[in-house]
Regions:
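Rhodanese-like catalytic fold shared by cysteine-dependent sulfurtransferases
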Residues: 1-23, 31-73, 84-132
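Short, surface-exposed ligand- or partner-binding patches at beta-edge/loop junctions that are enriched
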Residues: 76-77
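Conserved G/P- and acidic residue-centered "switch" motifs that form tight phosphate/ATP-binding loops
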Residues: 27, 81
Length: 132
């Protein structure tokens, strides 16, 4: 299968969302990450994998379909861009036609001290976010 998910840097994803108000931003991290680490403003929480087993959520596809339509652009974000890329391929395989992934995710890559949010990512780039 050819990877068709379009990868956008955080700033590019933010501008894409502003220029395409019909697009939906879905945060695929766990509910706890979404609530306690923070999330992009206006993101919907639809976990791809969640506690306690970190298995693919059997409700993911149905929840994504309820949140948007197959033809609307969907922008996915996770912690570092890996889970969202995987979820994007799954959505495409299930009929979604315009799927985008935020590279580096919300928290970004690990630095030399194994800390996130210090090299790249949505939060590092100073894009709008909130914490519950």
């Amino acid at each position: 299968m050819t990877e068709l998910v379009i990868h956008l840097a955080p700033h590019d994803a933010f501008h894409f969302l502003k220029e395409n108000p019909q697009a939906v931003l879905i945060d695929v991290r766990s509910e706890m990450e979404f609530l306690f680490v923070g999330h992009p403003k206006e993101a919907l929480s639809i976990p791809w994998r969640d506690e306690p087993d970190w298995e693919i959520s059997p409700e993911f596809l149905a929840r994504a379909r309820r949140a948007t339509s197959l033809n609307r652009p969907v922008v996915l974000i996770c912690r570092s861009g890996h889970r969202s890329s995987e979820a994007g391929l799954f959505l495409q395989a299930n009929g979604f036609s315009a799927v985008y992934n935020v590279t580096h995710g919300f928290e970004g890559d690990l630095n030399d001290q194994h800390c996130r949010s210090s090299l790249n990512g949505w939060r590092f780039d100073g894009l709008p976010w909130e914490q519950c």
